[in-house]
């Protein structure tokens, strides 16, 4: 089990980014959350098996159609045992 905190910069709000990340996380069995931030970024936490989390990080680098991702920051964190995925 691993945990990653991801901050996505670019035109990523108002394009369904959070919803597409949530669907992708649920289909991969990854727990965590995704949220729009006041500065225009999207922040997410992913917890799960390494391959599934890495797949979500890759997905975040592209996002849904309509999103323009300029930069993605990824920080390793200690897992907290999250059990579900939510949109904040």
Regions found by a protein language model. Name each.
Residues 1-88:
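Intrinsically disordered, low-complexity, mixed-charge
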